[in-house]
Amino acid sequence: MTQTYNADAIEVLTGLEPVRRRPGMYTDTTRPNHLGQEVIDNSVDEALAGHAKRVDVILHADQSLEVIDDGRGMPVDIHPEEGVPAVELILCRLHAGGKFSNKNYQFSGGLHGVGISVVNALSKRVEVNVRRDGQVYNIAFENGEKVQDLQVVGTCGKRNTGTSVHFWPDETFFDSPRFSVSRLTHVLKAKAVLCPGVEITFKDEINNTEQRWCYQDGLNDYLAEAVNGLPTLPEKPFIGNFAGDTEAVDWALLWLPEGGELLTESYVNLIPTMQGGTHVNGLRQGLLDAMREFCEYRNILPRGVKLSAEDIWDRCAYVLSVKMQDPQFAGQTKERLSSRQCAAFVSGVVKDAFILWLNQNVQAAELLAEMAISSAQRRMRAAKKVVRKKLTSGPALPGKLADCTAQDLNRTELFLVEGDSAGGSAKQARDREYQAIMPLKGKILNTWEVSSDEVLASQEVHDISVAIGIDPDSDDLSQLRYGKICILADADSDGLHIATLLCALFVKHFRALVKHGHVYVALPPLYRIDLGKEVYYALTEEEKEGVLEQLKRKKGKPNVQRFKGLGEMNPMQLRETTLDPNTRRLVQLTIDDEDDQRTDAMMDMLLAKKRSEDRRNWLQEKGDMAEIEV
């Protein structure tokens, strides 16, 4: 059936409808924990700004969550431009909040913007009580829509201020409607650690338990508690902090020379960054630079030994907290920091502090240096045992493969790059020591239904198999030549198609690689935004709009460039955005043991030749969730 494609066919989503249509773009849909974290972050931001001393969290028996703080209370006056109470605007409008400029909060998670409105959009009901100016206000929402106007429901003392947000998550948006109590507890404890002197309580009405946290010497106490009973080097954590006008960093770290479970946690504006990011990269680089300088100054480095990041990082337990204005995250769930300037800031501060500490604590410093040197020597011995496939040993390596010189699987990376032009730029941009590049011509074969004994008939698949050193459907990874195999395709729809076909190849015929965490997908940016000497990169249209929104308060007109493909980037841009470990974005391709069958069923439906009818039905059902380039 042919439909007319004109202006009437263009749909504009307003209010909170985009969130309800595509919740996965805004939050983690596994459980409603991330919604709770958004509300908790708002209260903790009040504490971070010095306006709150207590945050109470209650998990009710009906799986609803209530967060209460003694901050200033959400504003209830009428917004001058929108003509509605500010609290209503905050709950009902994306990107409405008091944290986009730095007038109200020097540092924040950027919430009361997307965060709290997403909670409203994905909840069956939200009730907000505000204590402010001697009065108690109440407003309520259901399914993202206001069902009760803001009204005064009581009075209170003028100094009795704060906000209470009680929400009931809509189970239809989540894989499991239940909060993970352990994750909630962990987040709350971490918030208490990062806000010394602030009291945080958690009441679990389902399990009838109550917990309270209040740390006076936050990071130090937390790390010491986590490694209690284990031999540590040094005995007391190496702690430090530094605050500038727009950035601040606090850390506590130590090493476990005899092994043990490592505490490795990082935060940005008190938001946990589970996947690390540029701040963690900066910490690692700062420690490495300082240790290298100390070893060279003391002349204790054996000839031929060069320390690398993993030598100093291997047994390091740390808690890192960074506060900064306008943090950039990889995705709305804020699990990985991508602000490039943060790596240099943290690295410089940590290097200076660690060099000073090493020279003031020479005995402990020499033990640390000895541990790092031993690690480097073990790594180098192990690398010598790895026999690389040469022309005289096994199949000849593909001629288009630009190999690396390192042999350590902990460092080596192979990038499968879409297109010869991008492959040429990538070869110039790479670090030749540990990064290998292999360009691919066009779209590879859909191998989902091809048997393992026939799949090597495809030249591209054959070259990939020879380059990585693994045969299709083999569980033997002893001849693996690279620790990371990274798929690097354009950010447009064609590139996504190629990335999908490569993912299918690895899931179907090289599953052992996926199971052991060796396969990654690189996320090149779609946009570059320039304002003066500042450069920003955006992965999606939403990220681009977010950056432009932040740049509105700066002088000058930003210039936006859309990359049509990787080949348009010069080597320096390609290195910064997709190859440099400190600034790139990589997503690991993973399959949980429990999801094996579900993954195979989904891939079969998407890629099998005889499943076109199933694909059509699936598109009719899920098509409104797709992001389509026109």
UniProtKB/Swiss-Prot annotation:
Cofactor remark from the record: Binds two Mg(2+) per subunit. The magnesium ions form salt bridges with both the protein and the DNA. Can also accept other divalent metal cations, such as Mn(2+) or Ca(2+).
InterPro entries found in the cross-reference section: DNA_gyrase_B_C, HATPase_C_sf, Ribosomal_Su5_D2-typ_SF, Ribsml_uS5_D2-typ_fold_subgr, Topo_IIA, Topo_IIA-like_dom_sf, Topo_IIA_B_C, Topo_IIA_bsu_dom2
Sites marked Interaction with DNA: K443, N446, H497, R615
Alphabetized UniProt keyword annotations: Antibiotic resistance, ATP-binding, DNA-binding, Isomerase, Magnesium, Metal-binding, Nucleotide-binding, Topoisomerase
Catalytic activity: ATP-dependent breakage, passage and rejoining of double-stranded DNA
Domain Toprim: 412-525
Residues that hold Mg(2+) 2 according to the record: D490, D492
Origin: domain of life: Bacteria
Family: Belongs to the type II topoisomerase family. ParE type 1 subfamily.
Subunit structure: Heterotetramer composed of ParC and ParE.
Protein name (record): DNA topoisomerase 4 subunit B
Annotated organism of origin: Escherichia coli (strain K12)
